[in-house]
UniProtKB/Swiss-Prot annotation:
Main location: membrane
Name used for this protein in its record: Macrolide export ATP-binding/permease protein MacB
PANTHER family the record matches: MACROLIDE EXPORT ATP-BINDING_PERMEASE PROTEIN MACB, MEMBRANE COMPONENT OF TRANSPORTER-RELATED
UniProt organism field: Shewanella sp. (strain ANA-3)
Gene this protein is translated from: macB
Pfam families for this protein: ABC_tran, FtsX, MacB_PCD
Enzyme Commission designation: 7.6.2.-
């Protein structure tokens, strides 16, 4: 005698009902051979559905053993049972249990997706099965576009998809009219004749008469197990062989499962568009806030650094005394032109300018204004980054000759020569008086912003020797400004300058102002403020993540039956986990994309509104935004996805 396909021995199944234990199946002993057509008959509450669930590996006995083709299922985990369902069983449910978002072909393909079949192969097989069952013209119809009988035939095709050994039909005619019910039974008999093992679970003895063996169950006990003399259907040996998966095919199958999960996630999102958008809203606001804040911080920082650069890029100012506010600084007279010449010879110094400042009344004709007269060297304009609008700068010869040549700024030109903007009315060559000293204008600088915006100060620059010898009569300097080579670290250069001057003076009777230190401090301050505001914006992301988790928990509850169907046709726990996790991540990624788009829109509005600087968007912040979206999807989507994956398939299928 050949080994039975299914064998149940001394099977008990108990459930906890409050403080009592309810035993639904008692000492069930049953074997079913390959190719049999068996009907399990019993009234409601008799235990027939529980027995079917055990036979179909949806449930496990509390005690006893169950063998499938010689394999003991008692020690198998949930994924091993899922594999048995994929390879050995096909389910036909009373209520069809089709997935409403998929068409007929899509529903039939589901078991093959989890079995890892090639996409083209499974589609061809699904279409072939549906055509064979008379649904060739309904391939693209969704369940709500099909009649009850047509939906049941789709479920039959789904049961046959993986070519399993056993078809389990739970009340296959229960939801059909009499005509459709008879058609269904003829279809099952036809499948039996082709060698399929059929197990029908029903309360209707008329339906059971179509089987060649009838098992009657009552109060959890088999009371009869007899052949049906009225049946004369001979089963042919089943010859269909499902090809084994290779490693390469397994990799493609894994990708197909991801693609299927992505498709289902998109379908779920499109089905509940408003809810999905509201779920995304927290993510959108959070991502837009973070990206916008970073862009604002970067833009403002660049603007401030640009303003600082207007004072002279990479410069060090040297002043007498110990620091700002030192009352003794006026008595320190050790900074001289020879110090400036010594500094100029340092290898890391680009240019140097001495400086002597004075305030004077500047007169031209009947116009008189108060301006700052700056005695500087010929390299001053390079050090400070000034450019000419008209004329020229003076040179070393002018310095040595105490030349009475002057360069004025745009503000001074406007005050003294309001009509001299054109070349025909240029201020060049005009003579003005600095106090009582006449000087000739040889150049006009272009307008230049100060470190903190436009300056209205009036500036006149003349050789420092002229100021020293012809105006103030002092031999010492008010300060020296050094521009460093761009490739040299400013802190190291600053220490070199201090060491040289200390050696020359014998003491440190001066202090330095390093613009690079100012720049670094501003960068740190801006980064700190950006981090602070971003941290506040991240709260919105967390709130959005909680919203995603909440909606995903609702989605799991709404789609419990779908989860049960997927498990019944062979989905692993990892497949269910992946599907809901991908959906959560997809919601967050879409929210992240919309958030970045909103941030760019904010930038456009900011520019149109006349912002004082431009928002600078960085690739890093955008990549970080998407990484953050993905992380939120994983973190807040994991709990709902895990809950879905841990659902009991029997409970899930029974959920309304």
């Amino acid at each position: 005698m050949s080994k039975p396909l299914l064998e149940v021995s001394a099977c008990y199944r108990s459930f906890q009902a409050g403080e009592q234990q309810l035993t639904v199946l008692k000492d069930i002993n049953l074997s079913i051979a390959r190719g049999e057509m068996v009907a399990i008959v019993g009234a409601s509450g008799s235990g027939k559905s529980t027995l079917m669930n055990i036979l179909g590996c949806l449930d496990k006995p509390s005690k006893g053993s169950y063998f499938i083709d010689g394999q003991d299922t008692s020690q198998m985990d949930v994924d091993e049972l899922a594999k048995l369902r994929r390879e050995h069983f096909g389910f036909i449910f009373q209520r069809y249990h089709l997935l409403g978002d998929l068409n007929a072909v899509g529903n039939v393909e589901v078991p093959a997706v989890y079995a890892g079949k090639d996409r083209l192969e499974r589609r061809e097989r699904a279409e072939s099965l549906l055509s064979r069952l008379g649904l060739g013209e309904r391939l693209d119809h969704k369940p709500n576009q099909l009649s009850g009988g047509q939906q049941q035939r789709v479920s039959v095709a789904r049961a046959l998809m993986n070519g399993g050994d056993v078809i389990l039909a739970d009340e296959p005619t229960g939801a059909l009219d009499s005509h459709s019910g008879e058609e269904m039974m003829r279809l099952l008999q036809e499948l039996h004749r082709e060698g399929q093992t059929i197990i029908i679970v029903t309360h209707d003895m008329h339906v059971a008469q179509h089987a060649d063996r009838i098992i009657e169950i009552k109060d959890g006990v088999i009371i009869s197990d007899e052949p049906n003399p009225a049946s004369n259907i001979a089963a042919a040996p089943k010859t269909e062989v499902i090809p084994a998966k290779t490693k390469a095919r397994a990799r493609v199958a894994a990708w197909d499962r991801y693609a299927e999960a992505l498709k289902m996630a998109l379908l779920a999102m499109s089905t509940h568009r408003l809810r999905t958008f509201l779920t995304m809203l927290g993510i959108i606001i959070g991502i837009a806030s973070v990206v916008s804040v970073v862009a604002l911080g970067e833009g403002s920082q660049r603007e401030i650094l640009k303003s600082i650069s207007s004072m002279g890029t990479n410069t060090i100012d040297i002043r007498p005394g110990s620091g700002f506010g030192d009352r003794r600084s006026a008595r320190v007279r050790t900074l001289t032109a020879s110090d400036a010449n010594a500094l100029k010879n340092l290898p890391y110094v680009d240019s140097v300018t001495p400086s002597i400042g004075s305030s004077a009344t500047v007169r031209y004709g009947n116009k008189a204004v108060t301006a700052t007269v700056n005695g500087v060297g010929p390299e001053f304009f390079r050090v400070r980054g000034y450019e000419l609008a008209q004329g020229q700068f003076w040179d070393d010869d002018s310095v040595n000759a105490l030349a009475q040549d002057a360069v004025i700024d745009e503000n001074t030109r406007k005050q003294l020569f309001p009509n001299s903007s054109g070349a025909m009315n240029s201020a060049i060559g005009e003579v003005i008086f600095l106090g009582d000293l006449p000087v000739r204008i040889i150049g006009v600088t272009q307008p230049k912003e100060s470190a903190f915006g436009n300056s209205d100060a009036l500036n006149v620059w003349v050789p420092y020797t002229t100021v020293s010898g012809r105006m103030v009569g002092k031999k010492y300097l008010d300060g020296i400004t050094v521009r460093l080579d761009e490739s040299v670290p400013s802190n190291a250069a600053e220490q070199g300058i201090i060491s040289l001057l200390k050696m020359r003076h014998g003491t440190q009777d001066f202090f330095t102002i390093n613009t690079d230190t100012i720049r670094q401090n501003i960068e740190k301050t801006t980064a700190t403020m950006t981090l602070l505001i971003s941290a506040i914006a991240v709260i919105s992301l967390v709130v959005g993540g909680i919203g995603v988790m909440n909606i995903m928990l609702v989605s799991v509850t709404e789609r419990t039956r779908e989860i049960g169907v997927r498990m019944a046709v062979g989905a692993r726990q990892s497949d269910i986990l992946r599907q809901f996790l991908i959906e959560a991540v997809l919601v967050c990624l879409c929210g992240g994309a919309l958030g970045v788009a909103l941030a760019y829109l904010i930038g456009v509005v900011f520019a149109q509104a006349g912002g004082s600087f431009q928002m600078i968007y960085s690739t890093t912040s955008i990549v970080a935004a998407f990484a953050c979206s993905t992380l939120i999807g994983v973190l807040f989507g994991f709990l709902p996805a895990r809950n879905a994956a841990r659902l009991d398939p029997v409970d899930a299928l029974a959920r309304e």
